[in-house]
Amino acid sequence: MEMGFRWYGSQNDQIHLADIRQIPGVRQVVGALFDIPVGEVWPEDQIIRLKHQIEAAGLKFTVVESVNIHDDIKIGLPSRDRYIENYQQTIRNLAAAGVRTICYNFMPIFDWVRTNLHFSLADGSQALAFEHRQVQRQPQDIIHEIENNANGFVLPGWEPERLAQVQQLFDAYAGVDETQLAANLNYFLDAIIPVCEECHVQMALHPDDPPRELFGLPRIYKNLADMNRIVAMNPSTANGFTICTGSLGENPQNDVPAIIREFVPQGRVPFVHARNIKFMSDQGDFHESAHLSSMGSLDMFAIMQALHETGFSGVIRPDHGRDIWHESGRPGYGLYDRALGITYLNGLWEALEKQA
């Protein structure tokens, strides 16, 4: 296992590579090219420039998060083939730079949804939160909430150019149900997996966040049954998963350690997001929490134990952190709480290693 840290680049992140290098145990930077429009080819020279920048700081770059999927592919429009060809070339360019894992998602319109970016916790810290009653509002209300409370940062999946077309996107998805969305994912996988095999790259699909239908939009990676359906679409191990403990754990019916034990031995999990959440109601409302098991509703020790016992050898990163110690950065992506999360996860892993 290698510990990683998500970084938004020197132009988009208040955190510096030198800061990341000083977090004990971090070996990988999980990065991306954030200025390339969705659907366009990522230029090889820009990928290599990012790789060299990361390596100059004494870190590695083998995981990309994310190469986003154009909505025409998810909707299944005739224009999807052009965007799929671009995606295939991006895979080749990333592979040429040494990238081996590509995290992506297949969520319509919104990559993730929270109803509060600054939910106040009892200790004075702030965290991301989701309340189901809040999504009864119009999507535009949620968009305003995100835009007005992001501390001046652009959040992944909430880029202004996409949000400006949100009504057109809802109209375009009007005829897409869960069955059709799954068929469109199948079409996409059939086109890109041969390229992945040729280039020795593994795709790592991220779970729906939260794993429930929102605004009438379908979801197709919510639980173990969905994962089995996705495996059946294309049996190649290049068709892999990101296990996001928080996203899957947002459904209390999901047994995250059991999911890990099912798919890590299959060689389908190159990438893990480790995050804890705390349920606030029986309706599935939650806020994010510190990584420590006792601070949330997930057993982080059992999760790390499942990874250890199944021989997980991919990259793991702390997911969203709280805003603590007067930090005011990109919500969920500050330095301090994610660094604390890494220290905790590393401690669990060392204990598991020495007990083995």
From Swiss-Prot:
Q: Which GO terms describe its molecular function?
A: ferrous iron binding; manganese ion binding; mannonate dehydratase activity
Metabolic or biological pathway: Carbohydrate metabolism; pentose and glucuronate interconversion
Q: Does the record's keyword annotation contain Manganese?
A: yes
Q: What EC number(s) has UniProt assigned to this enzyme?
A: 4.2.1.8
Q: What class of enzyme is it?
A: lyase
Q: Superkingdom of the source?
A: Bacteria
What does the UniProt function comment say about this protein?
Answer: Catalyzes the dehydration of D-mannonate.
Q: Which NCBIfam families match?
A: PRK03906.1, uxuA
Family membership: Belongs to the mannonate dehydratase family.
Its protein name is Mannonate dehydratase
Q: Which organism is it from?
A: Levilactobacillus brevis (strain ATCC 367 / BCRC 12310 / CIP 105137 / JCM 1170 / LMG 11437 / NCIMB 947 / NCTC 947)
